Regions:
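Short, surface-exposed "cap/lid" segments of acyl-processing enzymes
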Residues: 29-68
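Bacterial N-terminal signal peptides that target proteins for export
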Residues: 2-11
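Bacterial N-terminal signal peptides
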Residues: 10-20
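Sec/Tat signal peptide C-region and signal peptidase I cleavage site
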Residues: 22-26
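Acidic-and-aromatic substrate-binding clefts and catalytic sites of carbohydrate-active enzymes
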Residues: 43-47, 74-79
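Serine-dependent carboxylesterase/thioesterase catalytic core
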Residues: 37-40, 61-63, 68-69, 78-168
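Short, conserved loop/helix-junction motifs that constitute active-site signature segments
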Residues: 30-31, 121-125, 168-174, 195-197
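C-terminal catalytic-base region of ester-bond hydrolases, centering on the histidine
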Residues: 170-228
Length: 228
């Protein structure tokens, strides 16, 4: 039987146990994302990605994970621009310490990204590749400027670039591929030039070529795909 002194000590011990705060549960570590390299289209600039970048920041991406690349849209896709993209991807990987990047491209930028992935070593450095309204099998509207512009020639159906990108496997390596295309695209003709064999191909409805850049449903689809 406990003495009055022992009862008092036991009660004090019990009270102290309840008053002592439990150690705080450690917050779950934030999982970093792959750096995302955005590639704009013909006659455009990196500023076109403002809306999608804002959506991605709201979804948890840090500014340090988002990279809008600029390039001369009149140069040769395969001879000049794809190599410049490869150098930029290497720079991003060194800067972030990431093994791989994700690529999100619009229009002409899709051909640049594809050439880098297929012929420039990108199958080892790219995790996800996304094309918004890319002329992946060429577009007849490019004939309007093909006479004086190399990038326009590269976008024409049956061009050296288009033919080689689509020879054999259109989606090579372990890269995850996705395209988003509109049946009202006034730039890419025919509309079904965008989808690729082996990719996740998403129709977005009747949206103009440049409007895909600010379309909420397209943005949500891109973010969901990058998270897959």
């Amino acid at each position: 039987m406990l003495t009055p002194r022992q009862k008092t000590l036991a009660l004090l011990t019990l009270c102290l146990a309840f008053l002592t705060p439990f150690p705080a549960r450690a917050a779950a570590p934030v999982q970093p994302h792959n750096p995302v390299v955005f590639i704009h289209g013909y006659n455009a600039d990196p500023g076109v990605w403002g809306g999608l970048r804002e959506d991605m920041r709201a979804a948890g991406y840090a500014d340090s994970e988002l990279f809008s690349w600029g390039y001369d849209t009149h140069r040769s896709v395969n001879e000049v621009v794809a190599g410049q993209l490869g150098a930029y991807v290497d720079q991003v990987r060194r800067q972030t310490g990431a093994a791989k990047v994700d690529i999100v491209a619009h229009s002409l930028g899709s051909l640049v990204g594809r050439w880098y992935v297929k012929f420039g070593g990108g199958t080892a450095t790219v995790d996800h590749w996304v094309s918004l309204a890319g002329p992946n099998h060429g577009t007849s509207t490019a004939w309007a400027c093909a006479l004086w512009d190399q990038a326009c020639r590269d976008m024409t159906p049956g061009s050296y670039v288009v033919k080689n990108l689509n020879a054999g496997d259109e989606t090579p390596g372990a890269v995850k591929y996705a395209t988003f295309w509109s049946n009202c695209d006034e730039v890419v003709n025919p509309d079904d030039s965008v989808p690729l064999a082996g990719a996740t191909n998403t129709p977005v409805g009747c949206i103009k070529h440049n409007d895909l850049l600010g379309d909420d449903a397209t943005s949500a689809g891109v973010r969901a795909f990058l998270a897959s």
